[in-house]
Amino acid sequence: MIALVDCNNFYASCERVFRPDLENKPIVVLSNNDGCVIARSNEAKKLGIKMGEPAFKKREVFERNKIKTFSTNFILYGDMSKRVMSILRNSSKEIEIYSIDEAFLKCYNEDLNTYGINLRKKVKQWTGIPVSVGIAETKVLAKIANHIAKKYRKSGVFILDN
């Protein structure tokens, strides 16, 4: 089986690691030169903030809803990604880093649900970054399972099997 571990709202989550006062508050991360929205917390998503929206068109919405905005900090995101991937490397013999916030892992553990839950706990505890884990027989199915796992915030793990 293959697990896809995907960091939740990665850039926004990285900002929150160093600003715990922003937990459960709406935040967005803006592109270079603060041009448009490139990352949102779940709270900002619920307020209707869309990816790619020009920031200047949303300034009033940001102020009215007390949405905290951040300029991109790619050095921070790269460092946090390395920390997450280091944990994942120690959790599987085979890992394929897919993007800055996603990796596929080969699962050797028979109890896949416990494996996924333990991965989530370890990454959150050691980095402060929340992740979702989708597990299935192929990478494509693991990606689908991960999408479903994101809807189950409590466990954050979904296993797609026969």
Question: Predicted regions span which residues?
Answer:
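Gly/Gly-Pro- and Ser/Thr-rich, intrinsically disordered tail segments characteristic of DNA damage-repair
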Residues: 1-162
